[in-house]
Amino acid sequence: MTRAKSGKISKNRHKKILKLAKGYRGRANSCFRVAIEKVEKALQYAYRDRRNRKRDFRGLWIQRINAAVREHGFVYSQFIGALKKAEIDIDRKVLAELAVNNSDGFASIVEKTKAHI
């Protein structure tokens, strides 16, 4: 009986990894042993940074809201506290969008919260 070496299976696995490694520098795009390490590390970075992206965007929204609120004489933390007391349920993403693109709408929200500070 002949020896089965899983030729087709391993070739497909190698092809899959090398396809993911396309565009890498040096031997990482052509040598399977190097490519598999680089692809695994890249997937780890992608997994980590998908979570970090949420953190980064929240920070960006807070910075934008803080800058817009300071033009009206408030601080971010006071403004968010006043929003909660006024029972205005708008998330930070929408507030930042209003602050950047619709300053009149944002100003009206700030006016509604002034009574609750």
UniProtKB/Swiss-Prot annotation:
Out of the domains of life, which is the source?
Answer: Bacteria
GO CC aspect terms: ribonucleoprotein complex; ribosome
Tell me which UniProt keywords the record has, alphabetically: Ribonucleoprotein, Ribosomal protein, RNA-binding, rRNA-binding
Q: Quick one: a GO biological-process term for this protein? A: translation
As recorded in UniProt, coiled-coil segments are none
Q: InterPro entries annotated for this entry?
A: Ribosomal_bL20, RIBOSOMAL_L20_CS, Ribosomal_protein_bL20_C
Question: Could you tell me which HAMAP family the record lists for this protein?
Answer: Ribosomal_bL20 (MF_00382)
Concerning its family, UniProt says: Belongs to the bacterial ribosomal protein bL20 family.
Name it: Large ribosomal subunit protein bL20
What one GO molecular function would you report for this record? structural constituent of ribosome
General function of this protein: Binds directly to 23S ribosomal RNA and is necessary for the in vitro assembly process of the 50S ribosomal subunit. It is not involved in the protein synthesizing functions of that subunit.
